[in-house]
């Protein structure tokens, strides 16, 4: 009887520990929107040079979202959405502040800014608002949400690896989060850019792991 009770106590403690670890982790989906993920998205057509890598990233994001929902891991949807005329970017003369209005992407009422159908938010999942920059934290309520929910471990998926995913990685590190890129659930424009970020940049600000490694870690 004592042995059964001890076994039960150990089982409950292990499950409690797992719940605590999962409760301190969240997945941030960077721009899992039609602009990137839909075959007719402007940015996918304009910028993605490696369709194989892109398709693989979409499949893995779908796996991660499904796994997270089944295992109560918070999903945070961090898109970009701008008002008509892009007043948030204040007539930018260079960089993304110039490129986004020129391309006409991420308009609030447009098809491209909508979340991709297979991974769109469901009831109870947090949607970041206010974001105006490359980092998911710029101008947004992401940081306050993470802190209010005691989240310490941030896992990043989405687009594009060498732009907004990397910017969010750096920013999260500076804000003292433990940050991870799920490497095969992101995509750069081409393989060279992807490998450069993973091999030369990530280790300064966090770690990277594969979808399989993430799922095995969280089981």
Could you say what each language-model-derived stretch is?
Residues 28-31:
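N-terminal nucleotide-binding beta1-loop-alpha1 segment
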Residues 73-80, 182:
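Short beta-strand segments at enzyme active-site cores
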Residues 42-49, 93-101:
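Short glycine/proline- and charge-enriched loop/turn segments
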Residues 19-26, 36, 62-71, 88, ...:
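Active-site-adjacent betaalpha module
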Residues 33-39:
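Short acidic, Gly/Ser-rich segments with clustered Asp/Glu that frequently serve as metal-coordination loops
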Residues 23-25, 40-68, 73-75:
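A short alpha/beta connector and helix-capping loop motif
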Residues 4-14:
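Sec-dependent N-terminal signal peptides
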């Amino acid at each position: 009887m004592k042995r059964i009770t001890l076994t039960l106590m150990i089982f409950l403690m292990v499950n409690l520990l797992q719940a605590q670890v999962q409760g301190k982790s969240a997945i941030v989906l960077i721009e899992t929107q039609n602009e990137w993920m839909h075959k007719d998205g402007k940015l996918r057509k304009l910028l993605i040079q490696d369709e194989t890598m892109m398709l693989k990233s979409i499949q893995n994001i779908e796996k991660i979202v499904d796994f997270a929902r089944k295992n109560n891991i918070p999903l945070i949807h961090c898109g970009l959405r701008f008002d008509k005329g892009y007043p948030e970017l204040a007539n930018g003369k260079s960089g993304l502040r110039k490129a986004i209005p020129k391309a006409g992407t991420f308009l609030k009422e447009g098809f491209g800014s909508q979340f991709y159908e297979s991974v769109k938010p469901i009831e109870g999942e947090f949607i970041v608002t206010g974001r105006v920059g490359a980092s998911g934290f710029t101008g947004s309520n992401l940081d306050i949400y993470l802190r209010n929910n005691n989240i310490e471990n941030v896992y990043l998926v989405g687009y594009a690896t060498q732009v907004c995913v990397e910017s969010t990685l750096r920013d999260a590190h500076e804000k003292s989060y433990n940050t991870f890129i799920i490497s095969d659930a992101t995509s750069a424009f081409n393989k060279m850019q992807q490998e450069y970020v993973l091999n030369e940049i990530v280790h300064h600000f966090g770690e990277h792991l594969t979808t399989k490694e993430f799922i095995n870690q969280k089981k």
